[in-house]
Amino acid sequence: MIQAKNKATRHRVLIVDDEESMRLFLARILANSLKVDATLAGTCEQALRLAGNYAYDAILLDLLMPGVGGYEVLREIRRASPNIATPVIIVSVLSDQATKDRCIRAGANAYVAKPIERNSLVATVKAQIAGRRKPKTTGS
């Protein structure tokens, strides 16, 4: 796990990508820019096990993964896990509109295209975590 330097109010993020260099790159960006502790998964099976056992504030998920693939991981997370409502941000080289639309229909909350633009990634993750933590308001 890669931990944020500031220990106050850290967020837990699961990063799923089959390329170790990409996992580490994403984790470093988030640890240095946001208060994030990153858990890294290199396989779909590992991602499903982690998502099934631990709650996260956000999940970054690559689509093109060996094994069952990113779409199936997304569907399983949305079907039954402690992360059923956790924001899932797709991180992929596939950047066409049809792929983005398919991801949103499958339950993704946001999409960041590779190559990663640091500011875009940080803004997207920050917005998704903030949106999840907004208190619900009730009418009187």
What is the meaning of each model-derived region?
Residues 40-58:
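Acidic, metal-coordinating helix/loop segments flanking the phosphotransfer/catalytic sites
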Residues 20-39:
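Two-component/phosphorelay signaling modules centered on CheY-like receiver
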Residues 98, 116-125:
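C-terminal output helix
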